[in-house]
């Protein structure tokens, strides 16, 4: 496989390349992830840079990790599953709702043309923006705000990925999809959700596919939950 873009790397990133390979082969490929672009991007992006320093030794393990503000960086497999379900293409413009530490946006940015990502916690948004600059991932735009409202001035999008659990599919986000566009979101209660792929049909309707049960922190916003409890 060839890298699509060269990422800014530090020595510690190269030293942990073996851990990334093990993560990809043992956690992703063994569970059915097949998209070459997703696999290559997750081999490239230094996941450990997106977790707090005191947790970096666990960055490539099979599970989520706390990143502050009551939020988490998702399990590697779930990140791969959601991005693969988005069916990303090199020319795509993608919106992410729930930046967190920025890992999923970073993985997406190595695959698609441009990523717009919204985070409701300013501290996380600022941290992600700084990290993107450090890694020279210059095709990611970060905003602080209510992600359930989307990014109207940048719409429509080829894909939208929601990295928090919603009580229902946010209709505003569906309206910001291009015809043929895909939205991937966990939908359900505050404990368990069903991971859904919503595709906007050419006639304006929507087709929904279920991928399985997941657990995400709540999507808080006007078209989400009104609090986290």
UniProtKB/Swiss-Prot annotation:
Q: What does this protein do?
A: Catalyzes the methyl esterification of L-isoaspartyl residues in peptides and proteins that result from spontaneous decomposition of normal L-aspartyl and L-asparaginyl residues. It plays a role in the repair and/or degradation of damaged proteins.
What family name appears in the similarity comment?
Answer: Belongs to the methyltransferase superfamily. L-isoaspartyl/D-aspartyl protein methyltransferase family.
The source organism is: Pelotomaculum thermopropionicum (strain DSM 13744 / JCM 10971 / SI)
**Catalysed conversion reaction:** [protein]-L-isoaspartate + S-adenosyl-L-methionine = [protein]-L-isoaspartate alpha-methyl ester + S-adenosyl-L-homocysteine
The active site annotation covers 74
Its taxonomic placement starts with: Bacteria, Bacillati, Bacillota, Clostridia, Eubacteriales
* Identification of the protein by name: Protein-L-isoaspartate O-methyltransferase
Write the gene name: pcm
Q: Where in the cell is it found?
A: Cytoplasm
* One Gene Ontology CC term in the entry: cytoplasm
